[in-house]
């Protein structure tokens, strides 16, 4: 199978790279949080692994239009269905977005960011981009426990609070695709 080694919009991803179930999950335009909860009848668990001001990786700074060594709030999370990792996530929120008047992003705490983004009309979402995560990509760290040579897909999109961006990246475990079905939309 040919590797997709760069971020690309859906129309540039060969249709043969995804099964129908993978396509359904990866291209889902709504709240992934809500879809995961619905699919598992609320049994999925959201875990905040880390929330810290740190330097984003190069591809994140470029996409967000911030300069190195500017720090941003980085949130790393995972969604587990019982013990099975289904989705790992990384959110990068530049300081200017956090500091914007009225921003609800300053005190997210243990909550899922999706509960905030899709409940507030001041947030808009940019286009989704996709890529395969290989061992040399910085996001591989989040899924190395389950990779085992599997094809790992990720998606990312910019959200905007008014005009200020934040980046949401989601890495999908093969277990999600195996343990769920297209009918669980």
UniProtKB/Swiss-Prot annotation:
Subcellular location: Cytoplasm
Record-annotated disulphide pairs: none
Assigned GO CC terms: cytosol
Catalytic activity: chorismate = 4-hydroxybenzoate + pyruvate
EC identifiers of the protein: 4.1.3.40
GO molecular function annotations of the record: chorismate lyase activity
Enzyme class: lyase
Superkingdom of origin organism: Bacteria
Residues given in the record as substrate binding sites: 75, 113, 170
Entry's Gene Ontology BP terms: pyruvate biosynthetic process; ubiquinone biosynthetic process
Keyword Cytoplasm: yes
Keywords assigned: Cytoplasm, Lyase, Pyruvate, Ubiquinone biosynthesis
Protein family (similarity comment): Belongs to the UbiC family.
Role played: Removes the pyruvyl group from chorismate, with concomitant aromatization of the ring, to provide 4-hydroxybenzoate (4HB) for the ubiquinone pathway.
Protein name: Probable chorismate pyruvate-lyase
Protein's organism: Coxiella burnetii (strain RSA 493 / Nine Mile phase I)
